[in-house]
């Protein structure tokens, strides 16, 4: 299983290994070599049908569920290094039916220490389908792969001087994740 990521504002994609997938809300203990954590909020989908070079008019046939999550990046390093740290792809389950995205009142929110640091409505279905098509140009999509689209630029989340932070996320007023980053 791959986690295929489309960086914010880019047409290209890269893959994260499945060892980065965190689905149990476990706290992240920062390795000694990492002094800062960066992050990006994402919308993601699970691929439900294998495909290669998917035509945009058929993209909706290749996924059956969606959700929102968080990607963490270790330090301000190259993507290949910073995106491979274990438990840094916070892509929660269960996933929602794509129809939920059509209601713009459903909000995805991320909180750091109880303060909102990101909030968005959910009208991104076209971006999701475009990302599936672009990802399938570079790699063969398999059932179970995740396609994640960054919803903003990567930005600083926490530094070693903070000691510990709590990060929470919700969608449709339901809790998606709640964990700490501990330095």
Q: Across the structure, where does each feature detected by a protein language model lie?
A:
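Catalytic-core "active-site belt" of small-molecule-metabolizing enzymes
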Residues: 1-146, 153-183
């Amino acid at each position: 299983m791959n986690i295929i990521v489309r960086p914010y504002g880019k047409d290209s994609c890269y893959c994260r290994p499945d060892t980065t997938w965190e689905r149990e809300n476990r706290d992240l203990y920062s390795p000694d070599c990492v002094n800062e954590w960066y992050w990006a909020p994402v919308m993601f989908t699970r691929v439900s049908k294998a495909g290669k070079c998917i035509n945009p008019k058929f993209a909706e046939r290749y996924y059956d569920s969606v959700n929102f999550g968080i990607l963490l990046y270790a330090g301000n390093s190259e993507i290949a290094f910073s995106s491979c740290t274990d438990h840094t792809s916070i892509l929660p389950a269960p996933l929602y039916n794509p129809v939920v995205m059509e209601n713009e009142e459903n909000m995805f929110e991320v909180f750091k220490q109880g303060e909102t640091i990101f909030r968005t409505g959910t009208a991104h279905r076209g971006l999701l389908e475009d990302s599936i098509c672009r990802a399938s140009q570079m790699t063969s999509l398999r059932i179970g792969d995740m396609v994640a689209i960054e919803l903003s630029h990567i930005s600083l989340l926490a530094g070693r001087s903070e000691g510990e932070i709590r990060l929470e996320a919700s969608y449709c007023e339901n809790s998606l994740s709640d964990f700490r980053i501990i330095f």
